[in-house]
């Protein structure tokens, strides 16, 4: 029942698990004393920021009108996720960093 909504939630779960693995990779690198290279940092920042906002926006859509009301946490989560895209360099800046590295 409501297969379309189930599919959207499943996609969100896939993005969440990929993001979790990226964070674990950075944490393991830090724990081992290995420096994370700047390109990996830019890739993670870009991916996590974009997917975080995409998933939170999707959640707002799934909540319908309630997704925009302050009574539900999904509205705040989307605002916070937008800051994740912008803080520390926008996704466009991260793309430029990655592209410059790839063009070497």
Q: Which role fits each region the language model picked out?
A:
Residues 1-104:
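Alpha-helical interface subdomain recognition
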């Amino acid at each position: 029942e409501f297969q379309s909504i189930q599919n959207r939630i499943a996609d969100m779960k896939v993005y969440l698990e990929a993001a979790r693995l990226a964070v674990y990779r950075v944490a393991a690198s830090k724990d081992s004393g290995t420096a994370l290279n700047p390109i990996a940092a830019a890739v993670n920042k870009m991916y996590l920021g974009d997917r975080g906002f995409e998933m939170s926006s999707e959640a707002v859509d799934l909540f319908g009108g309630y997704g925009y009301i302050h009574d539900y946490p999904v509205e705040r989560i989307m605002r916070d996720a937008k800051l994740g895209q912008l803080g520390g360099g926008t996704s466009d800046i991260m793309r430029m960093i990655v592209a410059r590295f790839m063009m070497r």
